[in-house]
């Protein structure tokens, strides 16, 4: 029997604390800045992997029931979820993942930031035209094929309305899909949104034909813990005061959550390889003779 994997990371360095930035009205509309101190359970890239999401939530102590087509969630006392984006595409159950997350966000049980895949799906749902769509996006549109038009529109509105990143716990915690440089924390600018969604490319292409991303975490010296995903890694990756929790569930890896402020990660294994990764990040599988 497979069991959730847990690990704890202790902060070894305490950078000088940066002052909380004052936001203007426009920025406040774009950015969710909350004094909520948690505790939080932050979940990495789901990519439509509903079964693994439900298993991970159970491991974290959340009880989920489905009643009349709706998800009803009972969280552990005092805890809230936060989703680090890329809820959708590539996996087997994108519509139901959205049903679950939308319900939790609207009931005040969860926070959610968008990922680049969420933005792509919202745009495609609005267009109602699958022509030219390929791969994981096409799969999601096919899954939405039997859904009512009202739910398609509701899903697009939800994804469109997500703030680019969250600043939580009085500035001590930042959740952004692709991470975020310190100087962009608390910014509602287009530049901050673009970075939070997709990061920053160096302009180079690697041997797999993929753009090489700027390693912003290596230069990060901020006091806020930044929790992000976007680039799959074999196990949670701690660099300075940041952690990447996209452990590639949709590619056959794990779905991971970070418990905050405990700094403990909890992971459940993927039940299948739902999509092929162009770039290997998981160890080679060992097969018996």
Feature-to-residue mapping (PLM):
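Active-site-proximal beta-strand elements of phosphoester/diester hydrolases
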Residues: 40-47, 173-179, 243-245
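Divalent metal-coordination and catalytic microenvironments
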Residues: 45, 86, 115-116, 140, ...
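Active-site neighborhood of divalent metal-dependent phosphoester bond hydrolases
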Residues: 76-78, 90-172, 182, 193-208
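Active-site environment of divalent metal-dependent phosphoester hydrolases
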Residues: 48-51, 89-92, 119-122, 182-183, ...
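N-terminal active-site segment of His-dependent metallophosphoesterases
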Residues: 2-98
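Acidic, His/Gly-rich catalytic cores of divalent-metal-dependent hydrolytic chemistry
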Residues: 9-10, 14-24, 35, 194, ...
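A short secondary-structure junction signal
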Residues: 178-179, 184-190, 238-240
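A short acidic-Thr-Gly-centered motif at the start of a beta-strand
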Residues: 27-36, 73-75, 101-105, 166-170, ...
């Amino acid at each position: 029997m497979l069991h959730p994997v847990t690990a704890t990371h202790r902060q070894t360095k305490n950078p000088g604390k940066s002052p909380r930035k004052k936001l203007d009205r426009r920025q406040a509309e774009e950015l969710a800045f909350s004094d909520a101190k948690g505790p939080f359970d932050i979940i990495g890239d789901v990519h439509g992997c509903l079964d693994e999401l439900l298993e991970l939530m159970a491991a974290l102590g959340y009880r989920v029931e489905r009643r009349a087509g709706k998800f009803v969630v009972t969280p552990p006392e005092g805890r809230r979820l936060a989703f680090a984006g890329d809820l959708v595409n590539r996996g087997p159950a994108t519509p139901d993942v959205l049903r679950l997350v939308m319900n939790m966000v609207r009931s005040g049980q969860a926070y959610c930031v968008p990922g680049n895949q969420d933005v792509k799906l919202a745009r495609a749902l609005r267009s109602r035209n699958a022509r030219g769509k390929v791969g994981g996006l096409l799969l999601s549109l096919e899954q939405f094929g039997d859904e009512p038009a009202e739910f398609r529109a509701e899903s697009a509105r939800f994804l469109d309305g997500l703030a680019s990143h969250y600043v939580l716990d009085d500035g001590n915690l930042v959740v952004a899909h692709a991470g975020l440089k310190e100087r962009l924390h608390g910014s509602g600018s287009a530049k901050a949104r673009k970075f939070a969604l997709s990061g920053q490319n160096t302009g180079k292409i690697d041997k797999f034909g993929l753009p090489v991303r700027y390693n912003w975490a290596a230069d990060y010296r901020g006091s806020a813990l930044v929790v992000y995903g976007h680039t799959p890694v074999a196990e949670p990756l701690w660099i300075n005061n940041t952690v990447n929790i996209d452990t590639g569930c949709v590619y056959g890896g794990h779905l991971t959550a970070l418990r905050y402020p405990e700094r403990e990660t909890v992971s459940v294994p993927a039940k299948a390889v739902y999509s092929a990764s162009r770039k290997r990040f998981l160890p080679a599988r060992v097969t018996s003779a």
